[in-house]
């Protein structure tokens, strides 16, 4: 049975999500920060975590963004195969939602229309949109405003199959060590393993939208997430890059089949707020 969705609903929801994600920390990230504050051994690290929480409190009370970099809007649309869109084109609707959200929410406009000419578009469009067709008649929207302090620290490694799991571990640690304080730690580390050059990067990005409380259903991946979180926190980078045990809140790993000749690994790093929002229409 075909279900009709008016794209005005897409506009409305994305507008609201842009504002909410930039003003309020998601429940999983709020809990992660509070847990880290309670367990952090470094006095300076604990002080920084308390300051980050005070910043969140002020943002909530005064309805201002939790960070001055309100990011480039990255949107995942999971569209049920039984959905028919009515109204403006879906891409146009997504960008209109971003436009309204960033304008009405007084969020910083951070997008330039050309990577070389670099003239600001003045409304934070276009968004980066990823589509997938899934069973059903619903539309799931996942929005992640991605700041570029952490985005610039992300890496892709085209490993050889012989590098194996140890090569993957080394790649993840290398990316985090190179990022250091520049990714505004404590960070969330999204990792994509497998696929192709572009697929592993997309996996790593999608991994960042997963709750930090949700672990991989695959046993070896779940064990790898745990091991890498321990190794990353042993680096001592700490909150704000000034030392401590809390360098990362979580390591989220996604995998995909790959070619016999390759082992692509992408590491997409996000800062201590790791903004993301989810809605289903």
Which residue stretches match the model-derived regions?
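Non-transmembrane, aqueous-exposed alpha-helical and coiled segments at domain scale
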Residues: 1-281
